[in-house]
C-alpha cells in the first residue's frame, strides 16, 4: 500500500520543518573526522564507521575479543554530517575556500552586478521575502588574469584545493593496518592510471592534462573541493529543481541537503519554474558540493518559453547572472549544429534532450548555426573569469536503445572534442556529457569514442539505460549501464530516479536514485582496481561471517533500510546477536555451518598434530631431554 499523498501545502510545510530543525548529524555508529594537510585551512572531512570487536574465544564468563579497525569513508555531506556544527540555512554555510581565493590575489569584488536580470531582481522589493538574506558580493578575475584551477595547474601551482582533493581521494586508507581489510583483487582499468597513493602533484598533473576537472567557482566558497576524472573515484551527480507545476524553494533546499547526505558528489539545479534565481541562491549558499546548471533553461524563461525568441544577448546575461551567483559548471549544448538536426529525422524518438531540442528548434526556425557554437569563445571568456567549468551537453543523445550510437550522436560528440580544445585555449575546465539509452553490448564504444575524439576530457553520462521496458524502475535499468561505463572509464554518473520518464522526483526518489548510483560507482571502482576500494567490502564480509549484525547495518550504504529489513522478521535485540537470519534460520545458515566446519577442522588439525608429536616422542625413546646432536 503506497503512503498517503501529501498536498502541496503539506509538502511545503514538511520541507520548511526539515529546514527549521536541521542539525548536523552522523550516520549510526559513525563519527566525523578531519585529516589536515600542509597548506593553511586544508582540513578534509571523512566519516569513520566504528565497529564492534570480534569474539575470538574464552568462556561465557570471560570472553576474549579482538578489536576491529574503524573504516574511514568518503563523505559528501559537508557540515551537515558533523554533529558539532550548528546549521542555519538562513545564514548559509561557512566560506571554506574564501581565504584561499583571497590569498591568490587575482580576483576583485564587483561593485555592480554584470547581469541586467540580476539588477532587476535585486531592485524588486516584492521578492524580499523570498530572497536569501546574506547575498554574497561577487568576485571576478582581475583584468588580464585567469582564475581557473586548470590555469594554476598548467603554471605548476598546487592549490589548497588540489591538496584537499588528494587527501580526500585516498579516503584515509593509510590508516588501515589489517591485511584482511587491505586485500584487493586486481582490476581491469582499460588504460586508467590508478596510483597506490594519490598526491597533490598527481592531482595537479591530471588537471593540467585536461583529464580531470575541479568544479570550483570563485563565487561558491562554501563548496568542499572535489575532482572528476577517470583516474579518480567515480563520482555521482544528483538532479534537483522545481518545475512550472510543482516544488518550492524549501523543497529544493531540502532535496539538496538530502542529496549530499546520501552521497551526491555534485548537484545540478534544473529548475524551470518560478523564482529560479532566488531558488539557486538558497541552494548555492547552503551547498557543500559543486552546483551545475543548464543556463538555456533560464534563458528560455526570460523569453517566455519561446525558443525562436532566444538571443545570444539573453543567454550571455544568464551566464553572467549564474557565474556571479557561484554556479560551478554549465551544461552548454554548443554541439547541436544545424547540419546535424536532419540526422535525427529517422530516429524512433528524435531529440530527447531538452537543451538539444531547444537549440535544434532555434537553428531550424532561423536557419542559422547554433548561437552557442558561434559565440563559444565568448562563453569561454566568461567561464575563465569566474572558474566555471564547462559540461559540454549531448543534445543529440539517444532517447531509446534503437537510436543508440547513431550518426547524429557521434557527429555531435566529435564537435564537442573540437570545442574542448577551444575551451582549453582559455584555461577553462571541460567535461563531456554522454548518453542516454544504450544496450550493454554497445556501451564501451561510447567510452572509446569519447577518449579518442574528446582528448581524454572527463566523461559524464546519464546512465546509460540498458533497456526501455521498465518505467518506474529506470534507476535499475540505468544503474546497470552506469556500472559498466564507469568501469570503462566514465568519470561521473548522472543518477536516474524511479520517476525518470514519469514525473519530478521527490525526496525518497532522490535517495533511491543516489543509492543505486553509489552502488554502480563503487562497483566500477572495484572493477577498475581503484586502490582501497575493497576495504569496506572486506569489512562487511568479515562482519557478516562473524554475525556482527550492528556492524553490517552500519557499514551499509543505507544503514536504515538494512536494519529495517532485518527487523521485519527478527525485531528483538537478541536478533542482533543471533548466528542466523530469517532467510535460512538457525539450522541452515551457510555461514554458521562454515564456522562450525572451520572450528572442527581447526580442532582436528590440533588433534592430529598432537598425535604426530606423541608418536615422534615415542620414536625418540621417550626421553624428555635429547642429546645435542639429536636435537
Swiss-Prot record:
Residues engaged in binding Zn(2+): 437, 501
GO BP, sorted A to Z: thiamine biosynthetic process; thiamine diphosphate biosynthetic process
Keyword DNA damage belongs to the record: no
UniProt catalytic activity: 5-amino-1-(5-phospho-beta-D-ribosyl)imidazole + S-adenosyl-L-methionine = 4-amino-2-methyl-5-(phosphooxymethyl)pyrimidine + CO + 5'-deoxyadenosine + formate + L-methionine + 3 H(+)
Stored InterPro entries: ThiC (IPR037509), ThiC-associated_dom (IPR025747), ThiC/Bza_core_dom (IPR038521), ThiC/BzaA/B (IPR002817)
Subunit structure as annotated in this protein's UniProt entry: Homodimer.
Protein name per UniProt: Phosphomethylpyrimidine synthase
Organism of this sequence: Escherichia coli O127:H6 (strain E2348/69 / EPEC)
Upper lineage: Bacteria, Pseudomonadati, Pseudomonadota, Gammaproteobacteria, Enterobacterales
Amino acid at each position: 500500500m503506497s503512503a498517503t499523498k501529501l498536498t502541496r501545502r503539506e509538502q511545503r510545510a514538511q520541507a520548511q520543518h526539515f529546514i527549521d530543525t536541521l542539525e548536523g548529524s552522523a550516520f549510526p555508529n559513525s563519527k566525523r573526522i578531519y585529516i589536515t594537510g600542509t597548506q593553511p585551512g586544508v582540513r578534509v572531512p571523512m566519516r569513520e564507521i566504528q565497529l564492534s570487536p570480534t569474539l575470538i574465544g574464552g568462556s561465557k564468563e570471560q570472553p576474549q575479543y579482538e578489536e576491529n579497525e574503524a573504516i574511514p569513508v568518503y563523505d559528501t555531506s559537508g557540515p551537515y554530517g558533523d554533529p558539532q556544527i550548528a546549521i542555519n540555512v538562513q545564514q548559509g554555510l561557512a566560506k571554506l575556500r574564501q581565504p584561499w581565493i583571497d590569498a591568490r590575489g587575482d580576483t576583485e569584488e564587483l561593485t555592480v552586478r554584470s547581469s541586467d536580470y540580476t539588477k532587476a531582481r535585486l531592485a524588486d522589493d516584492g521578492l524580499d521575502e523570498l530572497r536569501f538574506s546574506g547575498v554574497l558580493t561577487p568576485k571576478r578575475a582581475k583584468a588580464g588574469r585567469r582564475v581557473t584551477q586548470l590555469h594554476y595547474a598548467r603554471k605548476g601551482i598546487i592549490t589548497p584545493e588540489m591538496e584537499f582533493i588528494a587527501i580526500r581521494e585516498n579516503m584515509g586508507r593509510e590508516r588501515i593496518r589489517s591485511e584482511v581489510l587491505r586485500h584487493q583483487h586486481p582490476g581491469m582499468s582499460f588504460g586508467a592510471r590508478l596510483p597506490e597513493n594519490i598526491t597533490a602533484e598527481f592531482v595537479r598533473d591530471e588537471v593540467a592534462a585536461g583529464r580531470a576537472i575541479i568544479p570550483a567557482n570563485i563565487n561558491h566558497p562554501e563548496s568542499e573541493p572535489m575532482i572528476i576524472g577517470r583516474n579518480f573515484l567515480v563520482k555521482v551527480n544528483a538532479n534537483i529543481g522545481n518545475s512550472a507545476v510543482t516544488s518550492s524553494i524549501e523543497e529544493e533546499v531540502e532535496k539538496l541537503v538530502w542529496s549530499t547526505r546520501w552521497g551526491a558528489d555534485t548537484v545540478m539545479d534544473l529548475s524551470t519554474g518560478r523564482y529560479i534565481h532566488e531558488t539557486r541562491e538558497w541552494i548555492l549558499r547552503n551547498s557543500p558540493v559543486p552546483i551545475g546548471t543548464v543556463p538555456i533553461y533560464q534563458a528560455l524563461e526570460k523569453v517566455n518559453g519561446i525558443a525562436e525568441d532566444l538571443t545570444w544577448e539573453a543567454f550571455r546575461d544568464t551566464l553572467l547572472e549564474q557565474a556571479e551567483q557561484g554556479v560551478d559548471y554549465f551544461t552548454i549544448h554548443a554541439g547541436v549544429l544545424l547540419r546535424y538536426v536532419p540526422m535525427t529525422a529517422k530516429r524512433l524518438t528524435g531529440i530527447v534532450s531538452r537543451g538539444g531540442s531547444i537549440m535544434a528548434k532555434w537553428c531550424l526556425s532561423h536557419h542559422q548555426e547554433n548561437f552557442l557554437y558561434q559565440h563559444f569563445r565568448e562563453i569561454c571568456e566568461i567561464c575563465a573569469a569566474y572558474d566555471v567549468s564547462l559540461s559540454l551537453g549531448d543534445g543529440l543523445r539517444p532517447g531509446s536503445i534503437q537510436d543508440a550510437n547513431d550518426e547524429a550522436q557521434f557527429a555531435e560528440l566529435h564537435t564537442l572534442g573540437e570545442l574542448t580544445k577551444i575551451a582549453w585555449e582559455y584555461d577553462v575546465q571541460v567535461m563531456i556529457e554522454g548518453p542516454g539509452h544504450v544496450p550493454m553490448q554497445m556501451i564501451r564504444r561510447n567510452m572509446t569514442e569519447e577518449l579518442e575524439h574528446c582528448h581524454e576530457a572527463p566523461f559524464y553520462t546519464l546512465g546509460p539505460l540498458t533497456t526501455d521496458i521498465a518505467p518506474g524502475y529506470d534507476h535499475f535499468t540505468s544503474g546497470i549501464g552506469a556500472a559498466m561505463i564507469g568501469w570503462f572509464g566514465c568519470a561521473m554518473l548522472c543518477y536516474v530516479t524511479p520517476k525518470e520518464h514519469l514525473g519530478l522526483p521527490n525526496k525518497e526518489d532522490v535517495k533511491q536514485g543516489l543509492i543505486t548510483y553509489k552502488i554502480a560507482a563503487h562497483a566500477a571502482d572495484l572493477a577498475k582496481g581503484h586502490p582501497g576500494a575493497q576495504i569496506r567490502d572486506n569489512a562487511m564480509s568479515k562482519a557478516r561471517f562473524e554475525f556482527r549484525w550492528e556492524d553490517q547495518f552500519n557499514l551499509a550504504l543505507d544503514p536504515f533500510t538494512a536494519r529495517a529489513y532485518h527487523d521485519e522478521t527478527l525485531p528483538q535485540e537478541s536478533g542482533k546477536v543471533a548466528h542466523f537470519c530469517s532467510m535460512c534460520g538457525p539450522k541452515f545458515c551457510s555461514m554458521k555451518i562454515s564456522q562450525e566446519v572451520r572450528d572442527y577442522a581447526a580442532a582436528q588439525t590440533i588433534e592430529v598434530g598432537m598425535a604426530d608429536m606423541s608418536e615422534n616422542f615415542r620414536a625418540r625413546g621417550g626421553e624428555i631431554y635429547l642429546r645435542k646432536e639429536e636435537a
